Amino acid sequence: MITVTVYRTDGSYSGFKAEGHAGYAEEGEDIICAAASVLMINTVNAIEALTSDEVSAEEGTSGYLSCTFPGGLSPQGKLLMDAMLLGLSQVSETREADSGKPYVSVLFEEV
């Protein structure tokens, strides 16, 4: 399962971390992993390219991605994060309804 932990400080997004694999199909053929990766990486890239928000991101092995927003997020950055979370929930709900198995879990943590 892909676990995405979204960090909030005083109710505002301060970052997120993603770990794991969906397990929907074999590596290289897993459309759930691909969809989740595209949503998260595009969000990081969009915040960097389309806002003046500071972004610190680290990508690792085994589906690991960590991203923080040291100066907080602008309204545009918040909207991009909201869109990412909407996309992740829709991917998860659609595939879970098909198989009865959760592939993506989104958790929120106040830091």
Predicted regions and their residues:
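N-terminal intrinsically disordered, cationic/polar leader segments
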Residues: 1-29, 41, 45-111
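Short, conserved glycine- and acidic-residue-centered signature motifs
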Residues: 32, 36
